[in-house]
Amino acid sequence: MTKVGIIICGRYSSCGGGKCLRAVREHKGGFSVYPPGEEIQVVGYSQCGGCPGGNVEYVPEEMIKNGAQAIHLATGLVVGYPPCPRIRSFKEFIEKHYKIPVVVGTHPIPMKYYADHKNMSFWGKSMEQIAPALFSESPETMTEYN
């Protein structure tokens, strides 16, 4: 079993996490990095605290106390508009300070967002490099997450 924490964007602080939890169950999106059949348990779910992400300094510690072995930065940070400009900083800080792996992405990118974002100059390759698991999903899976 792998225990994970999820940090979402502060803009979506009222999000119920339905797509993220579905992706955990289905091993899709960012959770496809874990072996099929391996149980994934969410031991923490919080938001970044809003720009500039003050909770990122403290929230991982609580998740680790609950047994988190990895932290996921939610897909909303990748596909929100504008995408979070601090994703790389959050990932680097958490990995270096807390010595825990960070996966960028939770649920697959919904096709309706991908269709818009893929043509924007600020997105494309830079997001594929930081969140590769999100870009490996089929168009059918992405459409299922609309």
What do the PLM-derived regions correspond to, one by one?
Residues 1-63, 83-86, 100, 108, ...:
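Conserved mixed alpha/beta catalytic, RNA-binding, or beta-rich assembly cores of soluble enzyme
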Residues 94-101:
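Alpha-helix-loop-beta-strand connector modules within alpha/beta enzyme cores
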Residues 57-92:
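Mid-chain, well-packed structural core segment of small domains
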Residues 75-79, 106-111:
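Short beta-alpha junction loops
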